[in-house]
């Protein structure tokens, strides 16, 4: 259904698109899914709220900045996609949808999340990437069943210690933030399987060898002078990731300094000879 709608509205002027979509949605879809992604919506079509058995609702890539209270009638909703819209605040009605398992909020203009988000105790996956977050909202630490957290491309400088409460968390994506140190709280979360801190400003990585569940760590595009130590079988993606054993930190520091000086002087600098250690 969603693909059909998108194919049709591509040929409809923006000022007529909203009315067309409303008329098209006359019956409850058999698959209990409505996909209005990329439909140029500026307001939510209220008729959708009559589909009380709806399980999946995709509103990605529109021009929405609010949602009506009638959305709260969709109490069977498990997946809600609001990414790539114009939300500056999360509509309170979203926090009343207590069956939500997956919530996509990426690529909006969110600076915080409401405390009422803690009511979504069935939430397993939360995407809040590419917003305006300068710190991870405390309410995220109250989502006890959360398994996947995507908070990349924000302006995070650190993570709250309360994050360790999320003992079901398995994957955390933090790429493209402003981390200058590896978040200490992650060292106390042995249940994590995937850690992504790509594109930050981390200069030193502590050992991650004690994280017994870890399967993948992505640390590329950091000004680091060492690679994180990991247990056998854990995949690393970043500088020195394929070297075994891990490079001598002294040699790594010397290499990094030479490279930095070379870039500053904009002239080639010979590599230092290896030490005998």
Curated annotation (Swiss-Prot):
Domain of life: Eukaryota
InterPro entries: Leu-rich_rpt, Leu-rich_rpt_typical-subtyp, LRR_dom_sf, LRR_domain-containing
Gene3D superfamilies xrefs: Ribonuclease Inhibitor
SMART domains: LRR_BAC, LRR_TYP
Keywords, ordered alphabetically: Leucine-rich repeat, Nucleus, Repeat
UniProt repeat feature LRR, residue ranges: 53-74, 76-97, 99-120, 122-143, 145-167, 168-189, 191-212
Cellular localisation: Nucleus
MF GO annotations: actin binding; alpha-actinin binding
GO cellular component: cytoskeleton; mitochondrion; nucleus; sarcomere
A Gene Ontology biological process term: cardiac muscle cell development
Disulfide bonds: none
UniProt cross-references to PANTHER family, sorted A to Z: LEUCINE-RICH REPEAT-CONTAINING PROTEIN 10B, PTHR48051
Biological role stated in the UniProt entry: May play important roles in cardiac development and/or cardiac function.
Protein name per Swiss-Prot or TrEMBL: Leucine-rich repeat-containing protein 10
Annotated source species: Homo sapiens
Gene label: LRRC10
């Amino acid at each position: 259904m969603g693909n059909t709608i998108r194919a049709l509205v591509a040929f409809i002027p923006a000022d007529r698109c909203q009315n067309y979509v409303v008329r098209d949605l006359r019956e409850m879809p058999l698959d209990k899914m409505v996909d209005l992604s990329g439909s140029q919506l500026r307001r939510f079509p209220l008729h959708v709220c009559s589909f009380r058995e709806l399980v999946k609702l995709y509103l990605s890539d529109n021009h929405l900045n609010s949602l009506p209270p009638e959305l709260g009638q969709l109490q069977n909703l498990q997946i809600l996609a609001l990414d790539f819209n114009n939300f500056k605040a999360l509509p309170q009605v979203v926090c009343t949808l207590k069956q939500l398992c997956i919530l996509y909020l990426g690529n909006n203009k969110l600076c915080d999340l409401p405390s009422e988000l803690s009511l979504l105790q069935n939430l397993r996956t939360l995407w809040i990437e590419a917003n305006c977050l300068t710190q991870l909202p405390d309410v995220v630490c109250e989502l006890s069943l959360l398994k996947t957290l995507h908070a990349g491309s924000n302006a995070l400088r650190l993570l709250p210690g309360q994050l360790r409460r999320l003992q079901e968390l398995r994957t955390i994506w933090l790429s493209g933030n402003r981390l200058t140190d590896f978040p200490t709280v992650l060292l106390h979360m042995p249940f994590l399987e995937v850690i992504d801190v790509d594109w930050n400003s981390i200069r030193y990585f502590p050992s991650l060898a004690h994280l017994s569940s870890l399967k993948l760590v992505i640390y590329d595009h950091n000004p680091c002078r060492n690679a994180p130590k990991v247990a056998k079988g854990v995949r690393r993606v970043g500088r020195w990731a394929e070297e075994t054993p891990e490079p001598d930190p002294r040699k790594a520091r010397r290499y990094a300094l030479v490279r930095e000086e070379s870039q500053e002087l904009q002239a080639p600098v010979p590599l230092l000879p290896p030490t005998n250690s």
